[in-house]
Curated annotation (Swiss-Prot):
Belongs to the RRF family. GO terms for molecular function: ribosomal large subunit binding. Keywords: Cytoplasm, Protein biosynthesis. GO terms for cellular component: cytosol. Responsible for the release of ribosomes from messenger RNA at the termination of protein biosynthesis. May increase the efficiency of translation by recycling ribosomes from one round of translation to another. GO terms for biological process: cytoplasmic translational termination. This is Ribosome-recycling factor. It comes from Bartonella henselae (strain ATCC 49882 / DSM 28221 / CCUG 30454 / Houston 1) (Rochalimaea henselae). NCBIfam families: frr. Gene3D superfamilies: 3.30.1360.40, Ribosome-recycling factor (1.10.132.20). It comes from the Bacteria. It is found in: Cytoplasm.
Amino acid sequence: MSVTSIMDDLKRRMHGAISAFKHELGGLRTGRASASLLEPLTVEAYGSVVHINQVANISVPEPRMLSVSVWDKTMVGAVERAIRDSGLGLNPITDGMNLRIPLPELNEERRKELVKIAHQYAEQARVATRHVRRDGMDNLKKLEKEGEIGQDEAHGLSEKVQKLTDETIADIDKILAVKESEIMHV
């Protein structure tokens, strides 16, 4: 394995940790409606379990309203049940093949709970980033031991890996701060 491929792999995997973190945060409900709120929900359709966005179109017609247009009339009840049983505290209103989902105001207690969950997601992303750093450091030590790179080069590269790790964790913290203010903003 070459130094370039090790560094490229580290960048790719650290970027992946940030992407996964952003995706998890997208599922957290803030005061604003977002189609990503319903994306993780599954429904039984045609003998298998699929995500809601595979049987319906999710849109945001108003800031505090979600609209779900189910493509198959027989699926309306299952989609409504999945939303109601999701634990998100949502109550869909059925209108033919469309479901309108008003988002209730978040109370202070629920906001604090959501911030705690966001912090847990951030910590998972930081841990994933540190695991990537450890793998990179191990690979550099292996290259040094095999004589492919010198001690000075290995030291310089390990500093680059640490810098990349610090930047990634700083990005995670920035994203968390934005999400936290979004959740707590009334």
